[in-house]
Amino acid sequence: MASELAMSNSDLPTSPLAMEYVNDFDLMKFEVKKEPVETDRIISQCGRLIAGGSLSSTPMSTPCSSVPPSPSFSAPSPGSGSEQKAHLEDYYWMTGYPQQLNPEALGFSPEDAVEALISNSHQLQGGFDGYARGAQQLASAAGAGAGASLGGSGEEMGPAAAVVSAVIAAAAAQSGAAPHYHHHHHHHHAAGHHHHPTAGAPGAAGSASASAGGAGGSGGGSGGPASAGGGGGGGGGGGGGAAGAGGALHPHHAAAGGLHFDDRFSDEQLVTMSVRELNRQLRGVSKEEVIRLKQKRRTLKNRGYAQSCRFKRVQQRHVLESEKNQLLQQVDHLKQEISRLVRERDAYKEKYEKLVSSGFRENGSSSDNPSSPEFFM
């Protein structure tokens, strides 16, 4: 969109010093009163601007107030080929910055604006068709959800009526009726998207300007692709609504990503992966998801440790039982040896006693034979 603005308005100043000079001042804070002698000239000038479609495409320029005009304000040449596109871009900035359009400074009522816009509606229709095609491509990259919600209330209005509603919304915002329009826009937005009802509220500080900008963005959409362009046509207010919608959708997207994040790592990968590798894989993930995955990893590791301890205990019990069986077998073998030795001892003892008894009988015939029992030992 910035490139189209640069192409359509080739006479804008390209010096960064001039743009910095304009941006450093808040032109709404000066509160310069208009001169009464210049009332007729200003009203006629504004009438020519509305009829000719030459509002400045720079947001900071306020050609219809008594503030010194911006260098970017200049009427387009009559023979330029981009005249219809300039019409559309001028209305785009007018709906995006309603705080610049002070009805007291313009000096005409909303009825005058309606007549001026209806008289120039045939030129606006041709420029709006070209703008809708460019806005459709922009909405496909930025997300058509917020644009469709902003364009929901403008499906039944034509392009001229949409710009008229934007002008009336700007006048109502300046006169103190901004809460009503903000509530109306919020109602349509909530009806269009139930999953983020708080989207479209840019903040308390710029609620009046954002509500008027949102109304202008909603009026900018007429039908299929133009409804997506309505969100971009809202300027500052529509952009704030889209940002709010993105912020409201962010937790849902994070939750949806978290549902499929467990499929990325199996239980075995979580257990075997090092802490450094896991932290590298979890970059850009929400804190709650990181805590949940690390808790799951700790639970799996504790479960594996408990299983290994149980296996070791069972294995050790089997080893001890096998050793016990071996020792029992050895004890039985020793008992058998003891019983065999006892039997041998008894046999030798019985033999000894027989020999001792036979030796006393033969002791009378041969005295040289030892008669002591130790002889047989």
UniProtKB/Swiss-Prot annotation:
InterPro entries: bZIP (IPR004827), bZIP_Maf (IPR004826), bZIP_sf (IPR046347), Maf_TF_N (IPR013592), TF_DNA-bd_sf (IPR008917), Transcription_factor_Maf_fam (IPR024874). Its main location: nucleus. It comes from Bos taurus. This is Transcription factor Maf. Acts as a transcriptional activator or repressor. When overexpressed, represses anti-oxidant response element (ARE)-mediated transcription. Involved either as an oncogene or as a tumor suppressor, depending on the cell context. Binds to the ARE sites of detoxifying enzyme gene promoters. Involved in embryonic lens fiber cell development. Recruits the transcriptional coactivators CREBBP and/or EP300 to crystallin promoters leading to up-regulation of crystallin gene during lens fiber cell differentiation. Activates the expression of IL4 in T-helper 2 (Th2) cells. GO terms for molecular function: DNA-binding transcription factor activity, RNA polymerase II-specific; RNA polymerase II cis-regulatory region sequence-specific DNA binding. Residues 363-377 have a biased composition (Polar residues). Residues 72-82, 198-212 have a biased composition (Low complexity). Residues 213-244 have a biased composition (Gly residues). Residues 292-355 form the bZIP domain. There is a cross-link at residues 29, 33, 335 (Glycyl lysine isopeptide (Lys-Gly) (interchain with G-Cter in SUMO2)). The lineage of its organism: Eukaryota, Metazoa, Chordata, Craniata, Vertebrata. It is found in: Nucleus. The keyword Nucleus applies.
